[in-house]
Structures are given as C-alpha cells and as structure tokens.
Amino acid sequence: MRYRRLHGSIPQLKIPSNVLTPLDQIWPQGLDKLDRPPLVLHQQGRADVLAWLGQRRAVAMVGTRAASDHGLRMAEHLGCVLGGAGWPVVSGLAEGIDAAAHRGCLAADGVPVAVLGTPLDRVYPRHHQALQEEVARNGLLLSERQPGESVQPGHFAARNRLLVSLSCALVVVECPDRSGALISARLAAEQQCPVWVVPGDAGRWSSRGSNRLLQNAAAPLLSPKELVEHLGPGPCHKANATAPALVKALGAGASIEQLQQTLKLPAGRLASDLLELELAGQVVCESGFLWKPCRP
C-alpha cells in the first residue's frame, strides 16, 4: 500500500510487471523482518528465481572492491562451486569481490543474483555493462531504487540488508575495517544467518575486517567443499549428466586443463562437476590438482 500512496490512488494505478510489492505472492518474506523493508523491488531477469529467494535458498557473498589477487581467486572459485552445486549466488555487482563471485557463478552455468545500489537503468561501475546484462540473462537483477533516481553513497550500504535477507548463509571473502561487508555480517548475525569468512593475509589491510570477524564466532571457510558439504545441493541443482564421461576421461588421473581438451567443456563446469563427484565419493583430488577415480 505504501507504493500506492506514493504513486497514486488505487483505481488509477497500474503497477508495472517488473515491480514487486509486499502484496505480491512472490514477495520474499524475509524482507518483511527488516527494520526498514523496501517499499518495492524492481526486478529484471528470471522471475522463477524469486521463489528460491523467498525461501532464502541462496548464498550471499560480499567483500571489498580493492581485493587482493587471493581474494579475487577465492571469490570466483566459491561462486563457481556454489553455482555448480545449484545455489543462487547473491552479491552486489560492485568492483572486486562482488564481480568475481558473479563471474564464477556464471562460469559454472549457475544462477547469479545481483542486488544493486543503483536503479536497474544504471550500471555502476560503467565497465560492468556486459556483466550486468549476463547476470540478467542467466539470473536476476534486483533494486529498490526507482528508475532515474539519483544515486547516493548510502544506497550501496542500504542494499546490504536486502542481500542478507534473501540468503541462508553469508560468505565474507575479504574486507578491511569499516567495510560495508561488515554491515552485512552484523545484519546476518542479527537474523541468525550463518556467517563464513575466508581467512586472509594477517598483514594485509584489506583482510583486517574479515579476519576480525573470526574472533566473533564467524566460521572459517578453508575450502568451497566445506560450505557445499554443510549446505547440501541447492534448489537449482541439476543432475550431472556428464558424470560417466568425466570419470572415464580421468583414466589414471587428469588435471582440469587436460579434461578441458578431452571433453571440450569450460573449466568452471568441470570444477563444479568434479566437486560433486568428490562429495559422492567417486573421485579424489590429489597433490598437484590431479583428479583420479576412487578405487572400488
């Protein structure tokens, strides 16, 4: 009703099809538990993803824009593994950790969800135009900002409360002190949403905030496998149709690069498929990242 009070009387109002209100059945109920729930959500992309978000069947990933190479690699790897395991990956489409998480999810043919601090008709940063379009094609874009609305610095911090409310777990990959990612972690703790942290270089400024979370009951995340084992398969998990061919291609042992040449599949897809087979006890990863079938 707040949307209607802002935009006109009910008999004259026609709400656009891409605008969600709290009266819609697919409105994510987790948003209503917020102190400041959004008036509306503007969405672009796959509407079916909203059903999973409504049940908080997604994993949020946050971190600094000025990430280290290690942080970027971990974010992309986590996004890839979670996407391959069927988990929608929720982040903010910002520079650094956010973008790496989305790219990893896309590499595994997963479902990325971007909660923007800008209206949907704005791209920030501008060089993320192609990435934003790809996320919309394969997943979902969400924003509480009206089209044409001017962008304020506080909008980016405000969207943190939304991505936490759509997720069943939060991963902080890397962030300094006084980072927006720490706001997300605090909100997650208030909502009893588990917080996982990738341990970072103790001497690097960009890891000080995330490392400090490990002193406050956040769980250390040492590998994506741990998180997938804890969560299980996600809501959009697909049966691994390539499993027999993949196990056969391993032979006595093969790297992902060798499997790429043999099976002509992207590295992200192979990594997520191999992790699924590892969790099922069918393959094992040995030193040197050599994958081998498990002996009967």
PLM regions: where:
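Glycine-biased, small-residue-rich flexible motifs in mid-sequence functional cores and linkers
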Residues: 2, 8, 13-296
